Amino acid sequence: MPRIETEVRLDFKDVLIRPKRSTLKSRSQVDVQREFRFLNSKRTWSGVPVIAANMDTVGTFEMAVELAKLEFITCVHKHYTPQDWATFAAKHPDVLPTVAVSGGSSAADVEKITAILKSHPDIRFICLDVANGYSEVFVQAVRNVRSAFPEHTIIAGNVVTGEMVEELLLSGADIIKVGIGPGSVCTTRKQTGVGYPQLSAVLECADAAHGLNGHVISDGGCTCPGDVAKAFGAGADFVMLGGMLAGHDESGGDKIEINGKLLKKFYGMSSSEAMKKHNGGVAEYRASEGKSVTVPYRGPVSGTCKEILGGVRSTCTYVGASKLKEISKRTTFIRVSQQLNEVFGRAPNEQEEQVSKKQKTG
């Protein structure tokens, strides 16, 4: 019999972070680095726990090169060939430890991942990514990949509830991707009615993972630096970004000019555009669960990354956290009916403003 859970689940837009007494004098005092030891691979990692999503127009080799300079991680999209990887590895061998090779649960994907990892042993991360991480087929794929690569750090998802986080960790994953439907170009919730508000999903999944010494990624739903900070405050060990990193020089695809404005294309990996590009079209038995949009051209991604980290550092000063590690212990969320005063409209994106000015003067 169908049942209703009456407890209200929350999204980033439903809360604000309550400020607390702080001894910090400047944002520059905040350490945004983290160091982790992973549950099953037993590897240690240190860096800034922000990850570029494994999407065509985000998780590119060009993005990986730039984000490596900031000690971010890039989950490279799965549509590069082994030859593409060989060319990239020859040019940028120092970037390989900061990237994940991505794939799904199919035999072809696992075979491709295996070929790439055998050719490039410096790659330390594997990202096993499917829309529905609740499938037993996916759990078995995680077990198989763990058996084949005992020392690689496995990212697996997506799920939104604690029991499945535990299942995947016990099956060999190290980091669980949390999020079904929150992405800016994802239409899963509309097409299927399935999903879970992202803030509550992160809170519940982080609690389950940390009980087993596992880790979680908040994947999707961030629209601004404040959302990234809320995800960390909710217990996310990493935050994965798609839309916030789209539209840059490193994002793949050509610039489009419409009415004098430069734009770039951004689309979900379950959109009809992605399926036409990689699978020859949308299969008769399924529906598109993503959309294709154009976003303002934003120039180099480094500027946006600095803005994101600046916002997170500022959050830490408001709650008295001298290290990013401390933010979840210092965070108290308050439910709100309104977050912003938008009497003069949306605040401009500084990166977009700078690019727009250059276009006008150029």
Swiss-Prot record:
Signal peptide: none annotated. HAMAP family: GMP_reduct_type1. Pfam families: IMPDH (PF00478). Its EC number is 1.7.1.7. Belongs to the IMPDH/GMPR family. One of its GO terms (cellular component) is GMP reductase complex. GO terms for molecular function: GMP reductase activity; metal ion binding. It is an enzyme of class 1 (oxidoreductase). SMART domains: IMPDH. It catalyses: IMP + NH4(+) + NADP(+) = GMP + NADPH + 2 H(+). The active site is at 186 (thioimidate intermediate), 188 (proton donor/acceptor). Catalyzes the irreversible NADPH-dependent deamination of GMP to IMP. It functions in the conversion of nucleobase, nucleoside and nucleotide derivatives of G to A nucleotides, and in maintaining the intracellular balance of A and G nucleotides. Coiled coil: none annotated. The keyword Metal-binding applies. NADP(+) binds at residues 26-27, 78, 129-131, 180-181, 269, 285-286, 314-317. GO terms for biological process: purine nucleobase metabolic process; purine nucleotide metabolic process. GMP binds at residues 219-221, 242-243, 268-270, 286-290. InterPro entries: Aldolase_TIM (IPR013785), GMP_reductase (IPR050139), GMPR (IPR005993), IMP_DH/GMP_Rdtase_CS (IPR015875), IMP_DH_GMPRt (IPR001093). The keyword Mitochondrion does not apply. Keywords: Metal-binding, NADP, Oxidoreductase, Potassium, Purine metabolism. This is GMP reductase. K(+) binds at residues 181, 183, 186, 189.
